[in-house]
Amino acid sequence: MKAVSYLIVVLGSSAAMALLFVWGGFFNISAREPHWSATTWLMGMVRDRSIAVHSNYIELVQVDGSKSLAVGLEHFHDMCRLCHGAPGYPQSEFAKGLYPNPPELASKSVQTRTDVEIYWIIDNGLKMTGMPAFGATHDKNAILGMMAVLRKLPSLSADEYHSMLDAAGLDKKTQNNSHGATNGDESHSPLIDQKGHHP
């Protein structure tokens, strides 16, 4: 009986301390204040496990790489490069103030993810990171195109990236957002199939 009473006291005290911590505003939500190392580790584990589990419902179909690149380049250049940069294009100034800082897409930490994980991240976004869910505004072909560009980044020089932009007739400077985002019926897309439900 004493053990039960002790457990109740401990749990009650812990809950009260947690409530005080939250209500008292002791946690600094500022993007200029880095997470504690334990928080970073925990959030990283939660993120990686969530991506791995939820992306398991996706089955990608082999597509024409050149076609996907053509579809994705405009979307990538207008949007993705602003936060992540691109060959010959550093991160935009505003992106340097994001926390966590958007990763370099040619980096090993990004490129070692599976295709279905990359697709899921682009499609669904990531909470509390500034990474938007492009699936809300872009169809599957566009998402696959952005993924195709991302996969090609490690082998691209700045000159090669500029040549791709020129060949596609794209302005090398920042463009406006009217770049042809599509959000129509995607159920008949020939480029991707789904296994089970898509969360």
Enumerate the predicted regions with their spans.
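Periplasmic c-type cytochrome electron-transfer domains
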Residues: 2-70, 93-94, 134-149, 167-198
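Short, mixed-charge, low-aromatic patches
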Residues: 10, 27-33, 73-80, 100-107
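Short, functional N-terminal and low-complexity linear motifs
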Residues: 38-44, 84-90, 111-116
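Sequence/structural segment immediately N-terminal to covalent heme-attachment motifs in c-type
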Residues: 66-89, 118-120, 124, 176, ...
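Sequence context surrounding c-type heme c attachment/ligation sites in exported
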Residues: 70-77, 81, 91, 112-117, ...
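Extracytoplasmic electron-transfer domains, predominantly the class I c-type cytochrome c fold
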Residues: 97-155, 199
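Long amphipathic alpha-helical scaffold regions
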Residues: 149-163, 170
